[in-house]
Each structure stands twice: as structure tokens, then as C-alpha cells.
């Protein structure tokens, strides 16, 4: 919504604006939220592609005059799809990139969640910018990819509040997906805030700030890592 991009402009936040072309792990059965990211049935393809391209155009026309938007992202993890549809995924992404360039020549087009597939079916080079979620930052195939890249989902740990700091595979202390790599732009934590989700309660509690917009312990940990501001004293068991 324009209210969101207005807020990003006002607060000085970068906005990775993304189309809702995505997939997720689970059975690739039509009718459920784990279904194939790209249609399995031929009769569904034309309508699906038309809808995705229309959403892309709407997104760009709504937000393109907002300085907080620094990239247009075509997707998130579309590799969670029926294996035989990968050619269709790649073809649609190319159409989307061309459309984004036509509607807004001033911004780059990104392929988000591009850490799979590997080998000949890679999708990370289809756009101008590649976003590698999670372990994709360290996969050999994606080192020095030849285009700008960023770690687009880093962390993904579930915690409550006040909670205990949960160090996941994205822990800054041991993750080298971006440090010292001049060809990688940085990383974005997944995620800022707890949120509603069709994935269930646990998948919705990966924020470093909870539903009530109160910081979890992880928030203070990141503040210390980036801003060198020590966290508060925490209650000790039995005290």
C-alpha cells in the first residue's frame, strides 16, 4: 500500500518491493498453500502469468515515485515448484524482468530467493540483482555471481518475548555469507516483526520485535553488534 512506502520514505528505510510470486516447502498439490509455485496444469498457465505480470505492473505504478524503493523484486523462492515447471518459472521471470525495465528504467530488477536450483537450472542471473536466502549465501555456486547480490533472508530463528537469544545459522558471530566480500551488498534480517502467517504460529514468530512491537532479546543483540550499545541487564533465574 502507498502508506507503507510513505512510511519507508519518512523513516529512511530501504524498501525491497516484491511481487507475490513465491513458493514454499511441502507437497506440491493444487489447492493448498504448499502448491507448486508455477502451475502444473497447462490450462492454468496463461491466466497465472497474466495475473503475475499485472501485479508487477500495479506494484511499479503505485510505488515508483517513492525514493525508498531501491529495487523491484520479481519473486521469492519460486524454485519451490513441481520440477517439470522450472522452464516455465525461468521464462516467466525473464518476461517480468523485461516488464520491470520497460516500466521503470531507473531501477534494477531482482530475483529474490534465488538460492535454488543449482547447476544449469539456476535463476539467480536472470535479473540485475540476486537475493540469496539463508544458506544460499555460502553455497559455492553463488560466490562472485557476476551481478550485485545480497543475503535477503538472514536469521530465521523463532523466539518469544522476553525469551532467550536464539542463535541460528545466520548468527553474525559465525556467518560469513557477506563479511569481507566486496561483491556482496550485505544482508537483511528475517525478520523485523512477528506477523500473521498461513504457515502457523511458529513460522510467524521469527521477528526480532514481537506482535506488540516490543523488542525481543535478539533485537538488543543486533543493536549491540551493529551499534555497540550494550543490552540491558537481564533477570537471572531465581532472582
Positions of the model-derived regions?
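Glycine-rich beta-alpha junction loops
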Residues: 78, 156, 191-195
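Ligand-binding pocket scaffold of soluble enzyme catalytic domains
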Residues: 93, 97, 107, 147, ...
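Phosphate/oxyanion-binding loops and surfaces in catalytic or ligand/nucleic-acid-binding neighborhoods
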Residues: 66, 181, 190, 225-232
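Aromatic-rich peripheral "rim/lid" segments of glycoside hydrolase catalytic domains that contact
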Residues: 195-239
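Generic structural signal for well-ordered alpha-helical scaffold segments
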Residues: 57-61, 175-176, 223
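Substrate-binding cleft of secreted/luminal carbohydrate-active enzymes
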Residues: 170-204, 219-220
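Active-site mouth of glycoside hydrolases
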Residues: 1-129, 133-147, 157-161, 169
Amino acid at each position: 500500500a502507498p502508506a507503507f512506502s510513505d512510511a519507508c520514505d519518512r523513516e529512511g528505510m530501504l524498501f525491497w518491493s516484491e511481487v507475490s510470486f513465491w513458493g514454499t516447502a511441502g507437497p506440491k498439490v493444487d489447492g493448498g498453500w504448499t502448491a507448486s509455485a508455477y502451475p502444473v496444469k497447462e490450462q492454468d498457465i496463461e491466466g497465472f502469468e497474466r495475473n503475475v505480470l499485472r501485479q508487477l505492473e500495479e506494484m511499479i505504478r503505485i510505488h515508483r515515485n517513492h525514493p525508498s524503493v531501491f529495487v523491484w523484486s520479481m519473486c521469492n523462492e519460486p524454485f519451490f515448484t513441481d520440477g517439470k515447471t522450472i522452464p516455465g518459472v525461468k521464462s516467466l521471470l525473464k518476461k517480468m524482468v523485461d516488464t520491470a525495465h520497460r516500466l521503470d528504467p531507473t531501477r534494477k530488477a531482482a530475483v529474490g530467493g534465488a538460492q535454488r536450483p543449482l547447476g544449469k537450472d539456476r535463476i539467480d542471473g536472470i535479473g540485475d540483482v540476486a537475493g540469496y536466502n539463508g544458506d544460499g549465501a555460502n553455497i559455492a555456486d553463488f560466490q562472485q555471481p557476476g551481478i550485485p547480490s545480497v543475503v535477503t533472508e538472514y536469521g530465521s530463528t523463532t523466539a518469544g518475548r522476553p525469551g532467550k537469544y536464539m542463535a541460528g545459522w545466520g548468527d553474525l558471530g559465525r556467518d560469513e555469507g557477506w563479511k569481507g566480500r566486496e561483491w556482496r551488498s550485505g544482508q537483511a534480517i528475517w525478520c523485523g516483526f512477528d506477523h500473521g502467517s498461513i504457515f502457523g504460529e511458529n513460522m510467524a514468530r521469527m521477528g526480532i520485535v514481537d506482535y506488540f512491537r516490543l523488542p525481543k532479546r535478539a533485537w538488543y543483540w543486533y543493536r549491540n553488534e551493529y551499534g555497540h550499545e550494550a543490552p540491558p541487564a537481564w533477570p537471572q533465574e531465581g532472582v
